[in-house]
Amino acid sequence: MEQPSLESMLELQRFPRNPFSLVLLLLYFPFGLCLFLIRLFIGAHVFLVSCVLPDSVFRRILLRVMSSVLGVYVSHSELRPWDQRGKILICNHRTAFDHSVISRIAPCCSPSVSCAPGFLCWARGFLELGALGSRTQLMESLKHYLSQPGGAPLLLFPEEDTTNGRTGLLHFSSWPFSLSDSVQPLSLTVQRPLIAVAVSGCSWVTELFWLLFIPFTVYQVRWLPSVCRLPRESDEDFACRVQQIVSLSLGVVATRHTAADRAEYVKRRRCELPAPKSQPLSPTHIQMAQHVKEVLPQVPLSAIHRDLGHTGCVDTTITNFLEGRVTFVAEEEETTGAAEGTSKSRVSRPLPQGFAKKPEDRHLSLQDRKQILYECARRKYLEKFGSVPGEEEEEGARG
């Protein structure tokens, strides 16, 4: 079967493209906002209950009932009885709350692979293993945890990141399969009306808002037969075999795309997003920019438009460029006429960009260069408009 592309495996847009569904979402928005606030209050009580009660069948049933009030419905089916002696549960990854949902129906815990240890990690329901600096340290900590008697099974997500679950699974990482020779696979599907279940690149806080905003989200868990390692089977081959079993249960393709490929694709797509279109420039703004361009031909129009957007004044913009308040990459000025006399050559010639070739240009001080640039701009302004604003008032005051 042909391997699907990463784009088809990820959810990149949250809102529906169907106009009818979009209208329904807009009509539902006020009710959803009220529902979010109510569920946020109830969710605080659910969190307190999960903290106070010990892990037991009664606690899991109570949390499932309270979670249904939050709009999270969990159903599970077994192809055969679950072998509860297994210490490793393997599942595909759909949302940021998969570990919390599955723990409602089975005693298990999921290690904090990407979440920093602390209160937030504990509050999200992850198993804290201390500060982990490398994958080797993580595996050593998990092996130590599994060696302790009476511990809950580990729920691991070999995909290491979420997909939309419609076309394919990310390549299973091999490190979870090095922890045990027997694993218990399960497949997870998630459904939700109106909007996408999870959008790539969004934080868990954003996903929590939409989880409480939407009327309901249905999680369906399917227990699959336990899988044992074959003689002389490597961790990589073991992972590929379990990936095939889970993908067949979901009706999708087991791909070779890794979590690193997914992260790179999301990053690249984010950089390639088109910039928002700017508002069309008014005729007055264009005329003002042209005046500045005639006085300072070496300044690019993009820099002129940008500064005029802040100042709204031709004289102020010219002053900003002359005094160096606005940085820009100068354009090459085209020569339109013969060179002027030697008396005006020092003022009229454009300043060299970069390292000057003539010795006299290299010995010019910064103040001299600014004065030359100012005189050149003033002369061109006088030739174009007849007078420089502000000088007429000074002459009138002297008279």
From Swiss-Prot:
Residues exposed to the Cytoplasmic side: 1-21, 43-399
Keywords per UniProt: Endoplasmic reticulum, Lipid droplet, Membrane
Pfam families attached to this UniProt entry: CUE
Matching SUPFAM superfamilies: Glycerol-3-phosphate (1)-acyltransferase
Disulfide bridge partners, by residue number: none
GO cellular component terms attached to this protein's record: endoplasmic reticulum membrane; lipid droplet
Intramembrane residue stretches from the record: 22-42
Segments of this protein annotated with the region Disordered: 332-364
Single Gene Ontology MF annotation: ubiquitin binding
Keyword Membrane appears in the UniProt entry: yes
Coarse class of the protein's main subcellular location: endoplasmic reticulum
Membrane spanning stretches: none
Topology of this chain in the membrane: Peripheral membrane protein
BP GO terms, sorted: ERAD pathway; lipid droplet formation; lipid droplet organization; protein localization to lipid droplet
Residue stretches making up the CUE domain: 284-326
Cellular localisation: Endoplasmic reticulum membrane; Lipid droplet
Protein purpose: Plays a role in the translocation of terminally misfolded proteins from the endoplasmic reticulum lumen to the cytoplasm and their degradation by the proteasome. Plays a role in lipid droplet formation. Induces lipid droplet clustering.
Family designation: Belongs to the AUP1 family.
UniProt xrefs under PANTHER family: ANCIENT UBIQUITOUS PROTEIN (PTHR15486), LIPID DROPLET-REGULATING VLDL ASSEMBLY FACTOR AUP1 (PTHR15486:SF96)
Protein name in UniProt: Lipid droplet-regulating VLDL assembly factor AUP1
Species for this entry: Xenopus laevis
